[in-house]
Amino acid sequence: MTKTLHFDCLSGISGDMTLGALIDLGVSVDQIQQGLHSLNLPDLKLRTEEVKKCGFRAVQIHIDHPPEKAHRHLHHIDAMIDEATEINDSAKALAKKIFLCVGEAEAKVHGCSLRKVHFHEVGAIDSIADIVGVAIAIDALDVQHATSSTIPTGTGAITIDHGRVAVPAPATAEILTGVPLMACDIESELTTPTGAAIIKTLARSFGPPPAMTPLRVGYGSGTRDLEGQANVLRVTLGELTEASSSQGQIETDRVTLLESNIDDATAEQLANVSELLMSAGALDVWQTPIVMKKGRLATTVSVLCDASRIGALQTLLFTQTSTIGLRRTEMNRSKLARESQTVETPDGPAKGKTVRLPDGTLRFSLENDEVKRLCAATGKSADQIRTEAQAAFAAG
């Protein structure tokens, strides 16, 4: 049976809450400690404490280490992980993937290259311990699947190295693009950049738990006390049922459909608006010809987006078209698990996309821009380029 984890993030998610919950599921503290020491952090000590939040027990994590002022770059952290002798390759890969998620967000919000990004809070020893510790724990649990509830960010303002900012912090907001958010009016930072990166990297879908048989439940505690609810993260370890396993590669999320009927725009104007909408973060944009009242020909402009982009996209539609009203529909979406992949063709590396079908088989498709690029460079037909790319993918 396929083992899975489901994260219930009613009070948000952070690195220490995640690590505490995974340890509460039964992962050995000594195993995590041994792996952390091999990061060339011999003075680091991981301690656990059983606490109560609103009357419920949970595991709270403490990271003890000498004070430091170092601001590390991503390549420094990657090197630390690569050189760790007591961490499995799969745990190393997961930890580096989580750090990359944070690094890409930091690069975007600060307007610099990934290599020049230097980590502040996330580069501190306790955050390194949280992320690497979580990766070690996930590897120890041997889970192949994870899902999560929608994510609350909290509200209000916090002070970081760059000054006072609104919640969620800029990096957190960037990481959570495309992730369904939970409505929340608690004035506190519930989800940190570390927690956001962990859940975005791990979770295949956001919403209710899948059909599964629960095996164990772990609770990780946050440091603050919240009014009216326990500041804990609940993580359930279970086995997917047969029906759920057969759909294990199908992800689900919530998206919003914005639509407007426009009868006084040219084809060029609508094409330009579509490009602007995609650049502003729409998941997809399409146009449908319709006949309106009085027999007028018109076009329905449809925009698919996640909740975080609704405001920006509807503002763009109101300012860039003549529409005076929009329809908004919330809907569930199912999609195959996918990831970017580069294959080595006879004409050099080419970027494509791999999706995993419900029966577990993989399907590869070359990006159309890559097809055009290779056709222009080689004079080959598009069919030949695609055939060679498929052969390269099949050869591994």
UniProtKB/Swiss-Prot annotation:
Keywords: Nickel. It comes from the Bacteria. Transmembrane segments: none annotated. GO terms for molecular function: lyase activity; nickel cation binding. Residues 333-355 are annotated as: Disordered. It holds the Pfam family Ni_insertion. The keyword Secreted does not apply. Signal peptide: none annotated. Belongs to the LarC family. This is Putative nickel insertion protein. It comes from Rhodopirellula baltica (strain DSM 10527 / NCIMB 13988 / SH1).
